[in-house]
Amino acid sequence: MIGRIVSRLPDRIGTYYEPFFGGGAVFFEMARQGRFKRAVLADLNPDLMNCYSVVKERVDDLLSELRGPAYVYNKEAYLAMRAMGTASLSPVQRAARLLYLARTCFNGLYRLNLAGEFNVPFGKYENPVIVDEPALRAASEALQKATLSCADFSEVLSGIAPGDAA
């Protein structure tokens, strides 16, 4: 599916815009193929964009945090991490929390309740990969050409010019 989407985009792009970044599948494939000079990536989810910012700028700190004792795979640790508020966490801790929850929750689902709290149940996996160092380092490298923002799509696309693509 990703190949079909990417094949519809120009081969060479000045700036690639992705206003609904989410998981970033199109961006990461375009980056792998070297099809743009720079990228503007945005999403309205502040936790998600913080995570990408940390992956881009502080991947070593993130890897170190994820290897800490709080990020073990068991139901008690998961529930404690899920219940933890994010206001007092550093950007690196917030990013690690998001990655941990995504790797250990039911089906990798991201869902917030009306109070803005992550409320996905614990996922039952044999041995989930919580720290995927090669993937995080590759993502960090790809993100070096990107400007990241937590913004509305109309604001993001206002800078598009000839030779750019979204």
Where in the sequence are the language-model features?
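SAM cofactor-binding core of SAM-dependent methyltransferases
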Residues: 7, 12-85
